């Protein structure tokens, strides 16, 4: 029924609908990308969204605040906290009400503190194929910005859009604009996935000579890998490249100057979309 309580009738929900949730495995997929580009990096993965991809504002702020606290403690005493040199944020939102601006201000202050401590912040630009600034990706002093943010000498905030596999063109879904600093592979990316087996079956099956043959089952990920697209996957590629560029860092952490140098080197090495002009 429409008002069935999932706690009382769990068999009406979940895997029996034959499909996995839209963003199931999002974090696992990102971790796999980081591992591919920076195999020696240590990953601290923190969940902020449910299986439907909705991020609660208070949860995001609380999580980022905890990350900054861990970073600050480690900078004060390397035996405590956690050494966070690059922070990847594969999420985005837009300002819909004046209150959203206040939320972004608080988020900016937290990220500014992390950057002050030498932590590079990498953000996905969004997948809406528009040039409207998304947040937190646009929380920097981009050309023509009216956000009141001034240039500083802290570790950079890097906003990343998605390239097609050819690395010659921007993916059609990727957000664009002067607030997007770099583009990286983000379409048809291969990475790790939870070994999930859904209820949907292959469309066609035709066994021959004792061999089972069938078309791809879109909900069968028992192999542990998947193909996915989005700026959520461009950002961790850049974040991992920056981490690899930093290499082994001092116990006390990375200086903002060293972080900026590493970012500049990585951005310079990324593919550049072909300019029609």
Language model features with spans:
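C-terminal subdomain of the subtilisin-like protease fold in secreted/lumenal serine endopeptidases
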Residues: 77-91, 156-157, 247-277
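Active-site core segment of subtilase-fold serine proteases
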Residues: 1-44, 59-62, 66-83, 90, ...
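Hydrophobic pocket-lining residues within nucleotide cofactor-binding pockets
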Residues: 48-49, 163
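Terminal peptide-recognition signature
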Residues: 30, 87, 241, 245
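Extracellular S/T/G-rich loop segment that most often corresponds to the catalytic His/Ser-adjacent loop
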Residues: 2, 138-247
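Structural detector of well-ordered beta-strand residues that form the stable sheet scaffold
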Residues: 44, 120-122, 158-159, 190
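Substrate-binding/access-modulating region of protease and related hydrolase catalytic domains
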Residues: 49-151, 219-236
């Amino acid at each position: 029924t429409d008002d069935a309580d999932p706690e009382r009738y769990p068999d009406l929900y979940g895997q029996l609908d034959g499909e996995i949730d839209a963003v199931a495995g999002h974090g696992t997929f990102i971790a796999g990308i980081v591992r591919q580009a920076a195999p020696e990096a240590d990953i601290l993965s923190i969940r902020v969204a449910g299986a439907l991809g909705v991020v609660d504002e208070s949860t995001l702020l609380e999580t980022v605040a905890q990350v900054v606290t861990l970073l600050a403690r480690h900078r004060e005493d390397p035996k405590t906290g956690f050494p966070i040199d690059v922070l990847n944020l594969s999420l985005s939102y837009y300002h819909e009400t004046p209150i959203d601006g206040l939320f972004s201000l608080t988020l900016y202050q937290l990220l500014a503190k992390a950057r002050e401590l030498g932590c590079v912040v990498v953000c996905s630009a969004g997948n809406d194929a528009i040039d409207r600034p998304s947040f937190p990706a646009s929380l920097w002093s981009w050309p023509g910005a009216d956000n009141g943010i001034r240039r500083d000498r802290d570790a950079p905030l890097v906003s990343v859009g998605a390239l097609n596999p050819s690395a010659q063109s921007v993916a059609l879904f990727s957000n664009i604009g002067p607030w997007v600093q770099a583009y990286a592979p983000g379409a048809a990316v291969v990475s790790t996935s939870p070994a999930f087996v859904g209820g949907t079956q292959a469309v066609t099956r035709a066994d021959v000579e004792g061999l089972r043959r069938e078309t791809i089952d879109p909900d069968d990920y028992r192999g542990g890998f998947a193909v996915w697209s989005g700026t959520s996957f461009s950002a961790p590629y850049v974040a991992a490249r920056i981490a690899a560029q930093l290499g082994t860092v001092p116990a006390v952490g990375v200086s903002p100057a060293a972080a900026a140098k590493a970012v500049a080197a990585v951005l310079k090495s990324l593919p550049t979309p072909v300019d029609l002009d």
